[in-house]
Amino acid sequence: MTSDLSKTGILLLSHGSRLDQGKKVIEAYTQMYKEEFPEAIVEYGFMEMREPNIPQSINKLTNGNDLEKIIVVPVFVAHGLHTKRDIPKLLGIENDFDESEISGGHHEHHHDHGHHHHHHDHDDEETFDFDGEIVLADPLGIDTRLYEIIKDRVSQNL
């Protein structure tokens, strides 16, 4: 890593689930990152349904650290409404999402994160105070390393 990690916070962001398995997975990835890069300032958080939520996670990153930048890595397989619209809104960053990109035009899975969301276990009014740069990385996407895992899962179940 060539950049100054002492000035950069890293937030590994999971969707969030009522089941505990998702929390265990994102905790494990966070721990792996910390073990490989001990000087890194890394936290995990959830978009919804679990804590720490995005504001709580950013507040944990910035507490006692003089950060200039936060890199948010959505640990999602692909872009979707959450990574294109909802997460940028929660982070307070500009996005170029066009609602007409929604295929079929009849999306029924509503998320209005600016108000009261019935799935949340936390207060939607929570905020964070960070004046530095927030970068939203791409989700995992198409990657031969993920394809290797897919092949392993098939082989394990033949």
Map each language-model feature to its residues.
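Active-site-proximal alpha-helix that buttresses catalytic centers in soluble enzyme cores
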Residues: 1-158
